[in-house]
Amino acid sequence: MSLRLRPIAAGPLSLAVLALTAGAAGGSPAPSAPARPAWAGFAGDAQHSGQTVASPQPLTSVHWKVTVDHKPSCCVDGPLAHYATPMVTSANTVVVPVRIGPRKGFRVDGYAGADGVRKWTFPTDYTVPIGSLNDWPPPIPATLVNDNRVAVAGGGGTILLRSHVNDVQGDVHRIAFYGIDSYRAHRAAYRAAVQITTPLTTGPDGSVYFGFSAAAGAPGGLRNGLARISPTGEGSWVPARRLAGVDKVTRIALNSAPALSHDGRTGYLAVVTGSVGRLVGFDTTSLRPKYEHLLRDPQTQGFATIIGSSSATPTVGPDGDVFYGVLGNPTLKHNVRGWLLHFDATLSHLRTPGSFGWDQTVSVVPSSSVPSYAGTSSYLLVSKYNNYLIPGHGDGRNEIALLDPGAAQKDRFSRVQVMQEVRTVLAPTQVPQQPPGAVYEWCINSVAVDPASGSVMANNEDGHLYRWDLDTGQLVENIRLGDPAGEAYTMTVVGPDGTTYAMSNAVLYAVGS
């Protein structure tokens, strides 16, 4: 059903108050704090670990499906657009951002996870960043702030907060990191000049972080940068160039969600000048810069390449190490695989890289989830490992890899020492009319990992969803979602009942037993 969309009252909005009072009657006692969502946002949590709270059900049937893009940006093979992750509450409400079309914008829908019945919907006036028009269309930024509220990007760099996510009815409120009164006074100017450019990330205290763009002459002196909305509703921001300590830095990397340390005190994200990037660390309360590292190609030592068609975001490991995927320079020298750069928590020590980084966010697997693993690392990483079919370069043997961040081997595709391959699995389907051994790509930018069963849920461009058993290294299950389609990479998600959510050809599928 349609919901009321109204701005918040003047002055700071207390997010904590909204969480406690939304829907409370008269003198009723405030309810206890909401439970933790099953899947809060991109890659599951603020560290982007990709870990599930429930083991996936067997892949035997499609329970329900919904279209996530009604006017996809098409090419011959399939849609080339990044889509926002579905979010799932502990009560099994699935929040799905939907692209209606280039001119009609976006909306957000809430579904009952058990049967796919739509419970609510609301539109957003969000517009995509002006600078993204030459890249694959970006997703609409959204995150569950807690188990009862969703934050969605709105027009002019604002955030729309929908309360009572698990209920049919709920109010939608608007908040602006630069002040709602300023937005009201200069609505048209803000809407024309300011857009949110990254997925939203929720901190452990309920703060929301995101990158934004601001055109020249934007109201309030805004410049491209990073914003925070605190649990009490107060906004703050910092220019991208101040985060990097370099005036030439122009913006936050498009589509790259901020990642947070496990204690929530340090955030990480990429800033760019043209296609040259820096990974920066910042204080999550004050937004003051803490750390910075210029990103380089491990093979050529040239500047690594950051482009807007990538959705790569940092991952924070259990030990605080930070991982971030980049393209090489030149990109063809490593078969357009890119590199997974690996840093300590202070970004001062560059560790062994991974042999793939293009448009991916690695997921984290406790080493105890892989009984046959004989190494010494406490955790492992799941990485896309495609070797794209490019004449004179890649052979089209596209894989996923389980990598050991604490061990090294010689790269199969260069002379660089890279993270050790614990397991790899080749995609199973030959591409028609291509050389023998050239298989469909693994179509993933973030995969759901189940620590309990030691398995990974991964999409493939052959139209199937697969379960990869990390202990045996075998693809043990699959289900057909649709016809083969070349498309921008998508994520997998697992809900609290074990339903797996996967996208193929602009459709979200709910899969289980």
Label each PLM-derived region with a short phrase:
Residues 11-14, 56:
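Low-complexity, intrinsically disordered regions enriched in charged/polar residues
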Residues 18-36, 48:
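C-terminal region of N-terminal signal peptides and the immediate post-cleavage residues
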Residues 1-12:
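Bacterial N-terminal signal peptides that target proteins for export
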Residues 33-42, 49-80, 88-96, 101-138, ...:
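Extracytoplasmic/lumenal domain signature
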Residues 4, 16-20, 43, 491:
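Exposed boundary/loop context
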Residues 5, 17, 31, 416-417:
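Intrinsically disordered, low-complexity serine/threonine-rich segments
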